[in-house]
Amino acid sequence: MIRIAHVVNPVDAKPPSDLVTAQPITYASMQIALHNTTDVEVCGVFYPEDEPIVPSWFRKLYPLKRSVSYLKKFKVHRKLPLFKEMLDRVCEETDADYIIQTNCDIGLMPHFYQFVRRQIEKGYRSFIINKRIIPGHYKDVKDLPEMYSEIGGQHNGYDCFVFPREDYRYYEMGDVCMGVPWSEGTLSASMVAAGECTSIKNAHLTFHIGDSRTWLAQNLVDYRLHNTNEVARVMKLFAGKDPKFLKHEIINWLLFKMKHELSPYHSQNCQDLCALTSGLR
């Protein structure tokens, strides 16, 4: 039997954060999905002060210690965890064959774990599942049946990852932080570089309530820039080892986004990558 660990980063958010209403819905959807499978363990990685929000049925991994603000100074101090530390915890503390990582505001359809297991059985080594966006008026766990029935709209963002735990030792996560754009970049790049990574774009498997894009706030621009520069550094590293890396559809999409955001404030690695891929799209 394939053993799966699903890791998430609970946050004891306060109003007006969308996470106040999103997290209970996310965790309830996980519990429902667990009823339809076996050998899946949901693991929480969090700061000690966030423990009150963590469901009792989560396996609690060793608390996070560092944040991106320990590495450099930002205009507005936010205690945002390093993605690497989060994945280090689950890969070191579990004996799972496969790891699933999703954000704490990503709801699961009841058949989610069954689908993931079936793809692994069919030979998919690693894959990224694109979420669907459903209307933003849902606020209550009791509305989950209605949320499930929403077809929703397709979204290109990467926020659900499935990969073999044994591959993680080859990954280069850099110092990207959670909670702001481009947190997904180095994991996506690492999965592609490790080989046989697929993007599942149109399946009805995960959902996000609304599309408020609060992460576009101007006071968080330097966090976004930090993550983008880290992603470019890692992608350039992988491209130097294998020129075909840049042609993968997942990398193609990341580079497309990077080109559209490129500014004089981005690193030389960003400039170089965008110059290398001037023919994209």
What are these regions (language model features)?
Residues 1-22, 26-27, 174-281:
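C-terminal catalytic/acceptor-binding lobe
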Residues 3-13, 47-49, 63-69, 129-132, ...:
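Short loop/turn segments at strand-loop or loop-helix junctions that form parts
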Residues 16, 48-55, 135-138:
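Short, charged/polar "capping" segments at the starts of alpha-helices
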Residues 20-40:
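Short, acidic, metal-binding catalytic loop of nucleotide-sugar glycosyltransferases
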Residues 38-49, 125-129:
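Short, hydrophobic beta-strand segments that form beta-sheet elements in well-ordered domains
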Residues 44-97:
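Active-site-proximal specificity loops/subdomain of glycosyltransferases
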Residues 76-79, 87, 91, 106-189, ...:
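Conserved catalytic core of nucleotide-sugar-dependent glycosyltransferases
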Residues 96-107:
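Short beta-strand-to-loop acidic/aromatic patch adjacent to the donor-nucleotide binding site
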